[in-house]
Amino acid sequence: MAASPKINRREHILQCLATMLETSPGQRITTAKLAAEVGVSEAALYRHFPSKARMFEGLIEFIEESLLSRINLIMDEEKDTMKRCQQLLQLLLVFAERNPGISRVLNGDALLGENERLRSRISQLFSKIETHLKQILREKSLREGKGFELDEAVLANLLLAVAEGRIAQFVRSEFKLKPTKHFNEQWNFIQQQLLQS
């Protein structure tokens, strides 16, 4: 008889938390509800995480590792400015779409009433993403000798705001309005405007 695979309880707790964020939009997740979902006592939850804030930090670490590692790949592998920007924004939107519960963390919706350091950490993540966009846009002028009419920081902020807006719509629609819907058409329009400047 084969041994059953050992469940990584910590990962299982985080998966259940993400699922609950997806299936209970607008509702606060309590440790009692989470323990019931996981099938353990609240005390068992606290053996793996000292607080609910640490559980959310576990999700944020997953978000950071997933997004930033892929952004670094885009930066290394793609050299075309417009393709880099498109791929970075598309990565963010696809990640949110594939992880609806986690998109509530990205959006900040799931962090209302939680520890301030969680919202601060998500804010820092978006600052890092915006910095990558600024770098991409600045490298265009270095590589091609011609930049944009608008300051790269202003453009990076605009591009990130588009992605954040799409994620906000996704959360607000209770995951019905996909963030990638019409992205290619929208990107083509944005790209044309950027290249004309």
UniProtKB/Swiss-Prot annotation:
Q: Which PROSITE patterns match?
A: HTH_TETR_2
What is one process in the GO biological process aspect for this record?
cell division
Domain HTH tetR-type: from-to ranges: 7-67
Show the Pfam families listed in the entry. SlmA-like_C, TetR_N
Q: Which residues form a coiled coil?
A: 109-136
Compartments in which it is found: Cytoplasm, Nucleoid
* MF (Gene Ontology): sequence-specific DNA binding
The answer to keyword Cell cycle applying to this record is yes
Q: Which InterPro entries match?
A: Homeodomain-like_sf, HTH-type_Tx_Regulator, HTH_TetR, NO_SlmA, SlmA-like_C, Tet_transcr_reg_TetR-rel_C_sf
For this record, an example GO cellular component is: bacterial nucleoid
The protein's UniProt keywords, in alphabetical order, are: Cell cycle, Cell division, Coiled coil, Cytoplasm, DNA-binding
**Residue spans binding DNA:** 30-49
Quaternary form?
A: Homodimer. Interacts with FtsZ.
Tell me the protein family, please.
Answer: Belongs to the nucleoid occlusion factor SlmA family.
Q: Which HAMAP family match?
A: NO_factor_SlmA (MF_01839)
Q: What does this protein do?
A: Required for nucleoid occlusion (NO) phenomenon, which prevents Z-ring formation and cell division over the nucleoid. Acts as a DNA-associated cell division inhibitor that binds simultaneously chromosomal DNA and FtsZ, and disrupts the assembly of FtsZ polymers. SlmA-DNA-binding sequences (SBS) are dispersed on non-Ter regions of the chromosome, preventing FtsZ polymerization at these regions.
Q: NCBIfam families, alphabetically?
A: PRK09480.1
Write the protein's name.
Nucleoid occlusion factor SlmA
Q: Which organism is it from?
A: Shewanella pealeana (strain ATCC 700345 / ANG-SQ1)
Q: Which gene encodes it?
A: slmA
